[in-house]
């Protein structure tokens, strides 16, 4: 990247993203300073080992990191709260410096590859409070199943810039090999062409020699032919001659056929599609990032301690669409649909609507949109198509739709109506990248889901146990309850560190779908207060093992036991993975006692 060469760059924060930015900038010739409020962040030894020329400073983030220095660009790590970096960011803004984060550098990297090699991949970007890892992983799988080369990165890991660096390094070797193969093929073609020319020349020389050897025979044959031919008028003789000359001239005229644009070897070996999972933290500093298609799956309360307000949180999410991306919108979420800008109105012209596709749990009402249809007791994933694209409609005439049934929702391995909607989002994104439908539908059937996201664990005594330990906020748990509760009753485990959330949105789905709720952790009393009026059994448990035992007693045949705490885990566990491990171990004890295998879940 030419714009980084010799540029003095300041990177705020030395986490995984900060380290990736430092590597990237140093590799492209920047003079890099990394600042962190910690004296010895865990990534410091790696930074010092890999980027020996990078300067590290510790201490508070103050304007002095920028003012009076040669710094000309400031990139901040996504985990740093706005108020923490504000003094530096404000000083950088006042000085007119280049600002952004890892996403900005990723976008600049793609622009550089486009200008140097003509590389223009499809970039599919995904965010949302819940479901983004599932949709990101599934979209990547669908793109690959459709035969396109793809890289998946971002919040899902690994980092954007590390993945781009690895792809570029791999592509350089692949491009050299491809160029060598093409040179060898061209040389072989040239040799074959030369051989054919030589053979033709030899054949012509032989024919000329044969002709010189028998001049008398040729003259006699011509004389005989002249005697048998009737004389014709001069005008008649001239006409064919003129036609022949004209034909020769026309044949000799060059045909102006434009040669197809040939991409460079680098552009042909780099990934055709990028699928990126992006958090609100990353999107808060996404200046210069322009995907080709993007989605916000949903917006529910989360990370308000970081963003401050729901509006700031939603605004950060909306940055994902950039200025030109196809917007893939969830019809079921009013906050998401509110991100669609008003049509641009030009005098005497039809209003111009931003390009968008919608998906949702209801029937689609617009060509190109995706939805769910229930018919004759079966639920289908469907897409709306225009019934007759060739027929012109009157202004006041409603558009006639053809509903294309794609596959039964029961054919999905991932459970719940919310996951059927996630599948529709992935289909819409992958379709926008030019992926064919048939192989994608096979890919949907193959996808088994992500760990700890409504993941089936076992069936014990006709009760199915699900691990949704990744459900660390109220919105995730609401989605899980609505998804699983469509065809069964649920005994749910709730509780942990609520991060100051409002638990009242749980009230309606718990009342509708839950047989009993078992409460654990620091915020169990707050959850009990929010659910007191729902008419459902509420039972406290001292720990997760006791909660699983209680659920086994409360559940009835055909029910589901769901660990979906709606809370963070750090009050009782190392992380949500540790919480899931304890849950699975407790379910394994139940399975052992019942004499069944943990592989009993579908």
Stretch-by-stretch model annotation:
Residues 47-48, 67-76, 80-101, 107, ...:
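Acidic, Mg2+-coordinating active-site environments of NTP-dependent enzymes
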Residues 108-158:
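Walker A (P-loop) phosphate-binding motif
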Residues 2-3, 8, 21-28, 404-514:
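Nucleotide phosphate-binding/pyrophosphate-handling subdomain across enzymes
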């Amino acid at each position: 990247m030419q714009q980084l060469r010799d540029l003095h760059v300041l990177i705020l924060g030395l986490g995984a993203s900060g380290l990736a930015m430092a590597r990237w900038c140093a590799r492209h010739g920047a003079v890099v300073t990394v600042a962190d409020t910690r004296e010895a962040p865990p990534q410091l030894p790696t930074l010092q080992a890999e980027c020996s020329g990078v300067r590290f400073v510790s201490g508070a983030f103050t304007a002095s990191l920028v003012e009076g220095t040669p710094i000309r660009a400031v990139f901040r790590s996504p985990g740093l709260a706005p108020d923490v970096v504000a003094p530096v960011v404000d000083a950088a803004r006042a000085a007119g410096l280049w600002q952004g984060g890892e996403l900005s550098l990723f976008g600049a990297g793609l622009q550089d590859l486009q200008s140097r090699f003509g590389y223009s991949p499809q970039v599919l970007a995904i965010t949302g409070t819940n479901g983004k890892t599932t949709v990101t992983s599934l979209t990547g799988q669908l793109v690959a199943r459709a035969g396109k080369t793809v890289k998946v990165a971002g919040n899902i890991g690994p980092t954007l810039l590390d993945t781009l660096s690895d792809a570029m390094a791999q592509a350089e070797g692949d491009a050299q090999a491809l160029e060598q193969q093409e040179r060898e093929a061209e040389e072989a073609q040239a040799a074959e062409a030369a051989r054919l020319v030589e053979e033709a020349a030899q054949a012509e020389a032989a024919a000329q020699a044969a002709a010189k050897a028998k001049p008398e025979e040729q003259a006699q044959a011509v004389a005989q032919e002249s005697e048998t031919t009737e004389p014709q008028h001069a005008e008649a003789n001239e006409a064919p001659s003129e036609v022949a000359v004209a034909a020769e001239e026309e044949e000799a005229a060059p045909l102006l056929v434009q040669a197809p644009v040939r991409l460079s070897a680098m552009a042909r070996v780099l990934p055709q599609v990028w699928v990126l999972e992006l958090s609100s933290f990353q999107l808060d500093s996404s200046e210069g990032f322009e995907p080709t298609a993007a989605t916000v799956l949903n917006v529910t309360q989360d990370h308000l301690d970081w963003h401050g307000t729901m509006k700031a949180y939603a605004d950060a999410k909306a940055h994902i669409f950039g200025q030109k991306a196809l917007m893939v919108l969830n019809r079921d979420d009013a906050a998401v649909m509110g991100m669609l800008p008003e049509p641009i109105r030009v005098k005497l012209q039809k209003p111009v609507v931003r390009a968008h596709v919608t998906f949702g749990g209801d029937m689609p009402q617009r060509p190109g949109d995706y939805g769910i249809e229930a018919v004759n007791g079966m639920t289908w994933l469907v897409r709306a198509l225009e019934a007759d694209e060739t027929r012109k409609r009157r202004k006041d005439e409603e558009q006639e739709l053809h509903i294309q049934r794609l596959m039964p929702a029961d054919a999905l391995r991932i459970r719940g109506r919310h996951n059927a909607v996630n599948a529709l989002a992935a289909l819409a994104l992958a379709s926008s990248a030019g992926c064919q439908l048939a192989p994608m539908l096979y890919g949907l059937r193959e996808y088994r889901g992500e760990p700890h996201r409504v993941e089936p664990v076992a069936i014990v005594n006709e009760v199915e146990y699900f691990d949704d330990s990744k459900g660390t906020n109220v919105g995730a748990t609401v989605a899980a309850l609505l998804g699983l509760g469509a065809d069964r009753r649920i005994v749910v485990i709730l509780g942990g560190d609520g991060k100051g959330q409002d638990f009242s949105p749980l009230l309606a789905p718990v009342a509708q779908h839950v047989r009993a709720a078992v409460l654990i952790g620091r915020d169990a009393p707050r959850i009990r207060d929010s659910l007191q009026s729902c008419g459902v059994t509420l039972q406290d448990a001292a720990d997760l093992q006791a909660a699983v035992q209680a659920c086994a007693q409360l559940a009835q045949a055909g029910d589901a036991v769901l660990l979906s705490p709606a809370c963070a885990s750090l009050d009782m566990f190392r992380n949500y993975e540790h919480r899931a491990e304890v849950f699975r171990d407790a379910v394994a004890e139940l399975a052992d006692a019942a004499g069944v295998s943990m592989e009993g879940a579908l």
